[in-house]
Amino acid sequence: MSISSRVKSKRIQLGLNQAELAQKVGTTQQSIEQLENGKTKRPRFLPELASALGVSVDWLLNGTSDSNVRFVGHVEPKGKYPLISMVRAGSWCEA
Protein backbone atom coordinates (compact mmCIF):
# COMPACT_ATOMS: atom_id res chain seq x y z
CA MET A 1 0.00 0.00 0.00
CA SER A 2 1.42 3.39 -0.98
CA ILE A 3 1.18 6.75 0.76
CA SER A 4 -1.45 7.82 -1.78
CA SER A 5 -3.70 4.85 -1.04
CA ARG A 6 -3.23 5.23 2.74
CA VAL A 7 -4.19 8.92 2.60
CA LYS A 8 -7.23 8.23 0.43
CA SER A 9 -8.50 5.30 2.52
CA LYS A 10 -8.06 7.21 5.79
CA ARG A 11 -9.75 10.31 4.33
CA ILE A 12 -12.73 8.23 3.20
CA GLN A 13 -12.83 6.44 6.56
CA LEU A 14 -13.08 9.83 8.30
CA GLY A 15 -15.84 10.92 5.91
CA LEU A 16 -13.90 13.85 4.46
CA ASN A 17 -13.71 14.99 0.87
CA GLN A 18 -10.48 16.30 -0.64
CA ALA A 19 -11.42 19.96 -0.11
CA GLU A 20 -12.23 19.42 3.58
CA LEU A 21 -8.95 17.59 4.15
CA ALA A 22 -7.05 20.29 2.28
CA GLN A 23 -8.61 22.95 4.51
CA LYS A 24 -7.59 21.04 7.67
CA VAL A 25 -4.05 20.61 6.35
CA GLY A 26 -3.72 24.17 5.08
CA THR A 27 -3.16 23.35 1.43
CA THR A 28 -5.21 23.19 -1.75
CA GLN A 29 -7.61 20.52 -2.93
CA GLN A 30 -5.40 20.07 -6.01
CA SER A 31 -2.44 19.16 -3.77
CA ILE A 32 -4.48 16.46 -2.05
CA GLU A 33 -5.71 15.20 -5.43
CA GLN A 34 -2.14 14.98 -6.79
CA LEU A 35 -1.04 13.15 -3.65
CA GLU A 36 -3.88 10.63 -3.89
CA ASN A 37 -3.17 10.10 -7.61
CA GLY A 38 0.47 9.31 -6.85
CA LYS A 39 1.90 12.40 -8.55
CA THR A 40 3.36 13.71 -5.27
CA LYS A 41 5.55 11.18 -3.48
CA ARG A 42 6.51 13.08 -0.31
CA PRO A 43 4.54 16.29 0.25
CA ARG A 44 6.00 19.15 2.28
CA PHE A 45 2.84 19.21 4.43
CA LEU A 46 3.27 15.64 5.68
CA PRO A 47 3.20 16.44 9.46
CA GLU A 48 0.05 18.54 9.05
CA LEU A 49 -1.53 15.80 6.93
CA ALA A 50 -0.76 13.15 9.54
CA SER A 51 -2.25 15.33 12.27
CA ALA A 52 -5.42 16.01 10.26
CA LEU A 53 -5.87 12.29 9.59
CA GLY A 54 -5.08 11.30 13.19
CA VAL A 55 -2.14 9.07 12.25
CA SER A 56 1.65 9.21 12.52
CA VAL A 57 3.98 10.38 9.77
CA ASP A 58 5.61 6.94 9.94
CA TRP A 59 2.26 5.29 9.19
CA LEU A 60 1.72 7.55 6.19
CA LEU A 61 5.17 6.78 4.79
CA ASN A 62 5.56 3.10 5.66
CA GLY A 63 2.21 1.78 6.81
CA THR A 64 3.62 1.06 10.27
CA SER A 65 3.39 2.97 13.48
CA ASP A 66 6.39 2.94 15.78
CA SER A 67 5.12 3.22 19.31
CA ASN A 68 7.30 3.62 22.36
CA VAL A 69 4.76 1.66 24.39
CA ARG A 70 5.06 -2.10 24.29
CA PHE A 71 3.45 -4.86 26.33
CA VAL A 72 6.16 -6.81 28.12
CA GLY A 73 3.94 -9.21 29.99
CA HIS A 74 3.33 -9.65 33.68
CA VAL A 75 6.30 -8.66 35.82
CA GLU A 76 6.94 -10.73 38.93
CA PRO A 77 8.56 -9.00 41.88
CA LYS A 78 12.12 -10.23 42.48
CA GLY A 79 12.32 -9.62 46.20
CA LYS A 80 10.77 -7.99 49.23
CA TYR A 81 11.64 -4.64 50.69
CA PRO A 82 10.90 -3.54 54.26
CA LEU A 83 8.28 -0.87 54.70
CA ILE A 84 9.64 2.11 56.60
CA SER A 85 7.19 4.47 58.22
CA MET A 86 7.70 8.23 58.14
CA VAL A 87 8.53 8.24 61.86
CA ARG A 88 11.16 5.55 61.51
CA ALA A 89 12.61 7.09 58.37
CA GLY A 90 13.02 10.42 60.17
CA SER A 91 14.87 8.90 63.11
CA TRP A 92 17.76 7.79 60.90
CA CYS A 93 19.13 11.25 60.30
CA GLU A 94 20.07 13.98 62.70
CA ALA A 95 19.90 17.62 61.83
Swiss-Prot record:
DNA-binding region per Swiss-Prot/TrEMBL record: 18-37
GO molecular function annotations of the record: DNA binding
Keyword Transcription regulation: yes
Keywords: DNA-binding, Repressor, Transcription, Transcription regulation
Residue span, HTH cro/C1-type domain: 7-60
InterPro entries, sorted: Cro/C1-type_HTH, Lambda_DNA-bd_dom_sf
Pfam families xref list: HTH_3
Transmembrane segments: none
Record-linked CDD domains: HTH_XRE (cd00093)
Extent of the signal sequence: none
Known function: Binds to two sets of three contiguous operator sites in the phage genome.
Quaternary structure and interacting proteins, as annotated: Homodimer, when bound to an operator.
Name this protein carries in UniProt: Repressor protein CI
Biological source species: Enterobacteria phage 434 (Bacteriophage 434)
Lineage, top ranks: Viruses, Duplodnaviria, Heunggongvirae, Uroviricota, Caudoviricetes
